[in-house]
Structures are given as C-alpha cells and as structure tokens.
Amino acid sequence: MAFWAGGSPSVVDYFPSEDFYRCGYCKNESGSRSNGMWAHSMTVQDYQDLIDRGWRRSGKYVYKPVMNQTCCPQYTIRCRPLQFQPSKSHKKVLKKMLKFLAKGEVPKGSCEDEPMDSTMDDAVAGDFALINKLDIQCDLKTLSDDVKESLQSEGKNSKKEEPHELLQSQDSVGEKLGSGEPSHSVKVHTVPKPGKGADLSKPPCRKAKEIRKERKRLKLMQQNPAGELEGFQAQGHPPSLFPPKAKSNQPKSLEDLIFESLPENASHKLEVRLVPASFEDPEFKSSFSQSFSLYVKYQVAIHQDLPDECGKTEFTRFLCSSPLEAETPPNGPDCGYGSFHQQYWLDGKIIAVGVIDILPNYVSSVYLYYDPDYSFLSLGVYSALREIAFTRQLHEKTSQLSYYYMGFYIHSCPKMKYKGQYRPSDLLCPETYVWVPIEQCLPSLENSKYCRFNQDPEAVDEDRSTEPDRLQVFHKRAIMPYGVYKKQQKDPSEEAAVLQYASLVGQKCSERMLLFRN
C-alpha cells in the first residue's frame, strides 16, 4: 500500500518504444531508440530513483534509452565531488577566468568549449514527435480534478471499500499536480530570505571539528597515504572539502581557485545567482526575457539552429517547465529541492545559464547555454566546476547530498567523452543498476558499445519488479493497484506495456508513482 506523506504523488503517462529514429550524436537516421513517459508531476525522490535506473528528463518528458539496441548507448555518469581534484586543464580554465575578471585579459587563439550535453539534440527529439501526435498535454486540469475527487471519495468510503481496492490519499494531491504550462504552476519554490541560503559567491565556513579532522587526515596521509587514510574514512570521517590555505608544496583546492580574491579595481564582476525555475518566482520572471534571448543566440551560433526553431514555446518546454515538485524539508539545503536556473551575471548582464535539479543526493546538470561572445572563457568547463563546488557547498549543510550527476556518457561520441575527465566518476551498469568506477568500465567500452559493467555474473537488479500487482494505476478517476486494474482489461498489449513500465522504473517507483491509463 502506498502512502504519500510528503504531499502529492508522481503522476506519469508511459509510452513504450515503437520505432527507431534519428540519433542526435552519430546522425544515424534510424539508429536511436528509447522508452519515455510524460511526467505530469514528480517528486524529487522518485526522479532521483529513476536517475539511478538510467532515466533522464528533458522538460517534463522523462526517457530511458534502450541500451542494447540504440546506436549510441548512453550511460548515466556521476562525479564524486567530495573526492574531486581539478586537473591541469581545469585549473587553466579557472585561472583564465580570474585573469579576465581581475585584469580584463582575453586569451589569444581559439578555444573549444565542453558544455554539458544538449538534451534537445539527443534521443528525445524523436520521442517528442510521438508525444505531439498523442496530444499528451491533454486536459490536465481534468486529470488533476479526477485524482483529487478519487482521493476525497476514497477518504469518505474507506470504511466501506475493501482495503486492497483503493489506496490511502492526501486531499491536496490534485492541487499540487504540475500543469502542462509552467505559468500555471501551483507549487512554488521558496526563495530564501536575505541572509539565508547558500552564498554562491563565497566558500562555506569551516567548523573547528572539521579542522581537527583535517589535521588528523593529513597526519595519516604522511604516515600511510593508503591504508590508514582508508581506515579513517571507514570510521565515518569524510575527507575535508576545504583544506587549510595551500602552502607552497600543497596544491590549491577547487574552492581556492574559484574564490580567489580579486583586486578592488578589478576589470569585471561575476555574480552567480540561483533562481527557482518557476514563473511564480519574481527574479525568474524578471530575467526571463534576457535569459531567452541568450538561449536563442546560443542555439543559433553553437548548434546552428534556425531562429524559428528557438521559440519561447520550445525554450519554456525544455528548460523552464519541470515536473519536479519543490520541497523544503528542514534537513535539506536552504534553497530546497527542485529545478533551478543558475545564472552567471557579468557586469550586470547574463552570460550563461546552467539549468540544474537539486535532489536529495544529487545536483543534476540538465543543460547549459551561454553567450558565444564569451566562448574564450570555456564557460562549459567553468560552469561544471562551479556546479561541482556548489554540490560540495550544499553537502556541508546536507550530508547526503554528495554527488554531481552529469547526464549521459557516450564513449562512442568524441564530443561526449570529456565527461570522463571529471574524476573520480562512476558509470551506471545498465543491467544491475550499480555504480562502477569509470576506470573499470573503459576497457570494456573500447571493445563494445554496449557493456554490462557489473563483473559479478550472479548479480541481478535488486529493485527489479517482483510484485507487479502492487503497481499503482490511475484509471477512470480512481487509484487502484495493477492487480485490480488488470481484471478490467482484455487487451494483451496493455498488459505488456504496463509490465514493461514496471521493469524499467523498478519496484519502489512502481508502488509510489501513479501510472495514468486512459
């Protein structure tokens, strides 16, 4: 039996893959394949669990490549920020930014940037054509009202109904369902009051206890760089994120390089603002026009899109509209969980926007667009490093938030392999859904596009669907377990679709999320 103590449940419409379509990576006209679902509403926990099973969102569309069939297998990749050390090339980018801010220096020669992958140029493109045909953005108000009415009715009739026929409800669920248009969003991200929340322009403070742990860690490293340090961490002492100020023989940390003080007469000022992706937020609304213009400029210059292909409808659908319900739990980060735009303001003008999701365990990179006039600053790399540092900063307040999700890694695509340079990082096994260090995966990927990374032949998907009858369905204005729903169905293809959905989302999500069936 499912309970939604946190508020509204996730509500999704599932569409199994039927055809192959054009691949945005290798340009194969009929090589890409994925399954997808339209998320009317989704909790941050459900989306995080879906990420851990190889799913990814683009706007409100959530998709999962058919890994053993698609031409360019897309492996979920995450970086471990707590252990991250910037490489020489990363340091070069950060120093280049500091020189530009301090003295206005512009590097000579061209610079190839490494932006996070475009969720609009990949496998999603083919599936959106299907979604438009199916008119998935149907009468969502009716759906919301139906769910609310079903749950209210269940509350009144709970004594009369059999316990297995309907599930316990929350009266507010209908009010909190995400609508098809972001401007109608009901649930608004809470904006931290002045003086609260993470200050993105400054490194976080350190506690005396953390400083003592750091001293002990350094002492152990000097005595035994491998064994004793591992024992120290195994006792529950994480490695310090912000070590003492670097000495001449100690490399600077990521934070030292990002937040290095600038002279009072610096040539430029860079400010990073975290803005909830909601039209109910005044800062998001006031900066929308400038942000949209930047997006068009980026798409035309970098991806060679036609201006007509970069309308406000497309921009809003992909980068502003999100199914994620904002949450601000007391033990979470001050900014809360949900979808955000991380805006980079240079001298009062937006030059880059990183679209991110903040989840219980992850900061997830969705998309980046920037002003091509500032390509010499390598804003793709710079923003990724800032997001890694931001994850470390959030970890100081919320200890479980300790991973940076970089989307998909495609070994067969040269433009996507750069993600493997943010070490340490892990790839998700497409069969058992366990994380495996990327170093262990690369040899296999050199021999085959599709690989099972888990080397244990006996290992299985621990969250595989074992009790499909417990899957939750919303059908004919009622919420019911699949065991009840299937008794009303005679179409064998419907059973196949529902069981496929259950196998892809896993047992936990299948019991929490509502599968909408018309």
Curated annotation (Swiss-Prot):
> Where, per UniProt, does this protein localize?
Nucleus; Cytoplasm
For this protein, what is the EC number? Answer: 2.3.2.8
| Compositionally biased region (Basic and acidic residues) | 149-165
Q: Which keywords fit this entry according to its UniProt record?
A: Acyltransferase, Cytoplasm, Nucleus, Phosphoprotein, Transferase, Ubl conjugation pathway
For the modification Phosphoserine, which residues carry it? 169
* Presence of keyword Phosphoprotein: yes
Reply yes or no: does the keyword Nucleus apply.
yes
Q: What class of enzyme is it?
A: transferase
- GO molecular function, one example? arginyl-tRNA--protein transferase activity
Q: GO cellular-component terms in the record?
A: cytoplasm; nucleus
Ranges for region Disordered: 149-207
From the UniProt record, list the reaction(s) this protein catalyses. Answer: an N-terminal L-alpha-aminoacyl-[protein] + L-arginyl-tRNA(Arg) = an N-terminal L-arginyl-L-aminoacyl-[protein] + tRNA(Arg) + H(+)
Q: Report the family membership.
A: Belongs to the R-transferase family.
The protein's assembly and partners: Monomer. Interacts with LIAT1; LIAT1 is not a substrate of ATE1, the interaction takes place in the cytoplasm and seems to increase ATE1 arginyltransferase activity.
Describe its function.
Answer: Involved in the post-translational conjugation of arginine to the N-terminal aspartate or glutamate of a protein. This arginylation is required for degradation of the protein via the ubiquitin pathway. Does not arginylate cysteine residues.
What protein is this chain from? Arginyl-tRNA--protein transferase 1
Species name for this entry?
Macaca fascicularis (Crab-eating macaque)
